[in-house]
Amino acid sequence: MASAGDSILALTGKRTTGQGIRSQNVTAAVAIANIVKSSLGPVGLDKMLVDDVGDVIVTNDGATILKQLEVEHPAGKVLVELAQLQDEEVGDGTTSVVIVAAELLKRADELVKQKVHPTTIINGYRLACKEAVKYISENISFTSDSIGRQSVVNAAKTSMSSKIIGPDADFFGELVVDAAEAVRVENNGKVTYPINAVNVLKAHGKSARESVLVKGYALNCTVASQAMPLRVQNAKIACLDFSLMKAKMHLGISVVVEDPAKLEAIRREEFDITKRRIDKILKAGANVVLTTGGIDDLCLKQFVESGAMAVRRCKKSDLKRIAKATGATLTVSLATLEGDEAFDASLLGHADEIVQERISDDELILIKGPKSRTASSIILRGANDVMLDEMERSVHDSLCVVRRVLESKKLVAGGGAVETSLSLFLETYAQTLSSREQLAVAEFASALLIIPKVLASNAARDSTDLVTKLRAYHSKAQLIPQLQHLKWAGLDLEEGTIRDNKEAGILEPALSKVKSLKFATEAAITILRIDDLIKLDKQEPLGGDDCHA
């Protein structure tokens, strides 16, 4: 039987087993959580991250902070990946999911020290998570239809409250909801809101409140030549992922020419190859050509003569979205299976109008009325790159929240209301269990209170006092049927009191809380199951002389 502690293995590595590795993992997880803890909530503080090149990021987005950290400890990496997963799945709640996971681990470690087996704790945590999710959907969530559009705006504002655009949440809340509703898609009776169709552009200057929402897809490019039309009605769009520069022979190919006069023919052929490609695209009916590569100045004349609009050096990510919105196919090559080159009209996308407009101080290409899917664009204004980047992250998080609310239509009250309600419910539920899992469920219940505690302490309030009051409110709501309305009670961090957060409009998607609980529990269980760490030493490369031994 392996003893706890370190032992040297025969395969030149270090082994840590038993309680030693468990404590190490918990320490690493708590260290990660402590980094982001002070950034939670509407009055959370920002972090300044400077990378090895000297680039600066100022943010309080949990996923962004952890992404920039080079975490070496394996247990720490699990929490970093957890924040990324929450960011991808929900978009918001990345900080709280890490804090809850670390708290669950800390409490599980205490139970293990009291000789409770990890398997018992894992079963208890799974049971607690299952009951908590059930309780959220049955008792403390409500539909957005009961309040209407304002509930969606409030959820967006709650998401923004902790961000740089928090002071302008009223303005940005409406902006984000309008942007999400503009990309609504109905397919076989199912309504979805693909927020990837919302393009977010950043422009220096003016104030944040002068950001604008543009109907249509905005492309941060201009036409390749001023002689081209700046407006094209009934646009047929070719999306190309190759360059329309003069064709050059590949390196390593040499042509022996004895007659100098033939050099000109080779040069002309290099130009004619591209010319023929452009002819094929224009003959297919294209009157707008967007390409990720360059367009040779000699070729621009063809586009001007045919009255087509050409835009070069577009981002590939933009072209993919435009292709999806207009029904075009992003073409990588004109080569056919027969070895010829051809361009079919079926590869073209369609839009009502494409126009180059001046918005704020920049010229942009706007694609209006795309045929396959609607699109919208948000142009953010701000003082500098650091501010604009953080605004973009904030808007992305809010868009994700709005999508979740519009698709699931389920909301919960914010400000620690859900966590406190769940904590009291699970405490009562734990007392109904006669097995050892009771201890784990009770610890799970206590761990959830970390969220209201951190929210209060970040706002420079007395967390013990506020959380005690909050527990009293929720206890009454669960025990006295006439006081059920108290289940919406949450923290008011500005006044340092308790209030009805449903009335106050502090709302979050129920899905965000459910996924957050599930992810945090699974991450804690993953780390808790580890009882042995074997770290192999780096193998020394064999010396030059050893090969000839």
Curated annotation (Swiss-Prot):
Pfam family, one: Cpn60_TCP1
SUPFAM superfamilies: GroEL apical domain-like, GroEL equatorial domain-like, GroEL-intermediate domain like
GO cellular component: a single term: chaperonin-containing T-complex
Claim: Transport is one of the keywords in the record: no
Domain of life assignment: Eukaryota
GO molecular function, one term: ATP-dependent protein folding chaperone
Cysteine pairings via disulfide bonds: none
Alphabetized UniProt keyword annotations: ATP-binding, Chaperone, Cytoplasm, Nucleotide-binding
Stored InterPro entries: Chap_CCT_alpha, Chaperone_TCP-1, Chaperonin_TCP-1_CS, Cpn60/GroEL/TCP-1, GroEL-like_apical_dom_sf, GROEL-like_equatorial_sf, TCP-1-like_intermed_sf, TCP-1_chaperonin
Family stated for the protein in its record: Belongs to the TCP-1 chaperonin family.
Quaternary organization: Heterooligomeric complex of about 850 to 900 kDa that forms two stacked rings, 12 to 16 nm in diameter.
Name of the molecule in the record: T-complex protein 1 subunit alpha
Native organism: Caenorhabditis elegans
Lineage: Eukaryota, Metazoa, Ecdysozoa, Nematoda, Chromadorea
